[in-house]
Amino acid sequence: MASIAILGGGAWGTALAASLTVNGHTVMLWARRRQTCDAINARNENVQYLPGITLPAALCASPDMAYVCAGADLIVLAVPSCYLAEVAALMNTTPRFQRLRTAAVGQEYPLIGILTKGFIPDQEGMPHLITDALGALLPSGAHGQLVYISGPSHAQEVAQGKVTGLIAASQNPMAAIRVRELLRSKRVQVYSSLDVVGVQVCAAVKNVIAIAFGLLDAMAEHSEAFGDNTESMLLAAGLNEIQTIGKQLGSTHPETFTSLAGIGDLDVTCRSAYGRNRRFGRDIVHKGILDSFSGIQDLVSRLPEVGYLAEGVVACMHVQRLAERDRLKVPICAGLYAILNREKGADTFMQEILGW
């Protein structure tokens, strides 16, 4: 059994921490809010993000990152992309990482798992993959220990012990295999991959497609023109756009897009009632949620006002930058960008991408 640190007290981080604790690992969860830690330790519940789900009594939480990371064999970053740089900076200030900065590249570095989805922009606003951005933030000795974890895995179901499949992707095959074995259990199947680029692109862009799915879902309630066939059209077209972006950014394995990381994660994100991005698409139609914003830049800067985190909004802005730079044909992503930027309505969007 291993010692594992989960950095992030949201739903997904808490769910994975619970699963790993049930597996017999010693797990420490870091959360910024002391109230979250106190509730987990005293009541075995993450009241804010996983209400009603009883967590293992052996799972401990702390707001002290140095304490949580001190002896971990695996450190998992489970924070939204907008907080990744800040959390990585905090991790760098811990005594353990301060010591490791002076050490040679080797086995002293813990494995570093990454659950964060999306892209990280540079100072010019050009987006980069999570592992590339994180590699620039962490000591060079940690680069070979980075493992990206993704797949169709709603936090609520993982916390409830429902059977789930994940992909552990890394440029270092041994690191991917080690994380695979740590995460694997009777209820969680994990497969290793070397296509760390493709897996990350799938994880980021599927949230954009899910917003479009929410639009379609809401519009279907008032139109006889849309049905299951239409959803399959959108799903297939969305997967094609994900593959287009993945190939451009350097994906090495075409099968990634038909794996758990690709079609698997896309399907559950688009169809499940748990999905915040699908919910956002529905809210565009039913609640006019975009009416309070002047465009996508305004929306991104005030996204917390929505009341829940729809990561596909920010991802859509980044995909547009990539598409413009590399002249990529991604009509769903481009059309959705136009909607979020208040340039186009949902009806026009559906007519253009579905020929309706």
Swiss-Prot record:
Active-site residues per Swiss-Prot or TrEMBL entry: 206 (proton acceptor)
Coiled coil (residue ranges): none
EC number: 1.1.1.94
Catalytic reactions of this protein: sn-glycerol 3-phosphate + NAD(+) = dihydroxyacetone phosphate + NADH + H(+); sn-glycerol 3-phosphate + NADP(+) = dihydroxyacetone phosphate + NADPH + H(+)
Positions annotated to bind NADPH: 12, 32-33, 117, 155, 276, 309, 311
GO cellular component: cytosol
Cellular compartment(s): Cytoplasm
Gene Ontology molecular function terms on file: glycerol-3-phosphate dehydrogenase [NAD(P)+] activity; NAD binding
Family designation: Belongs to the NAD-dependent glycerol-3-phosphate dehydrogenase family.
Pathways per UniProt: Membrane lipid metabolism; glycerophospholipid metabolism
Stated name of the protein: Glycerol-3-phosphate dehydrogenase [NAD(P)+]
Main subcellular location of this protein, as a coarse class: cytoplasm
Entry keyword annotation includes Chaperone: no
Keywords noted in UniProt: Cytoplasm, Lipid biosynthesis, Lipid metabolism, NAD, NADP, Nucleotide-binding, Oxidoreductase, Phospholipid biosynthesis, Phospholipid metabolism
Enzyme class name: oxidoreductase
Keyword Metal-binding: no
Taxonomy of the source species: Bacteria, Pseudomonadati, Spirochaetota, Spirochaetia, Spirochaetales
InterPro entries hit by this protein: 6-PGluconate_DH-like_C_sf, 6PGD_dom2, G3P_DH_NAD-dep, G3P_DH_NAD-dep_C, G3P_DH_NAD-dep_N, NAD(P)-bd_dom_sf
UniProt record, GO biological process: carbohydrate metabolic process; glycerol-3-phosphate biosynthetic process; glycerol-3-phosphate catabolic process; glycerophospholipid metabolic process; phospholipid biosynthetic process
Binding residue positions for sn-glycerol 3-phosphate: 117, 151, 153, 206, 265, 276-277
Protein function: Catalyzes the reduction of the glycolytic intermediate dihydroxyacetone phosphate (DHAP) to sn-glycerol 3-phosphate (G3P), the key precursor for phospholipid synthesis.
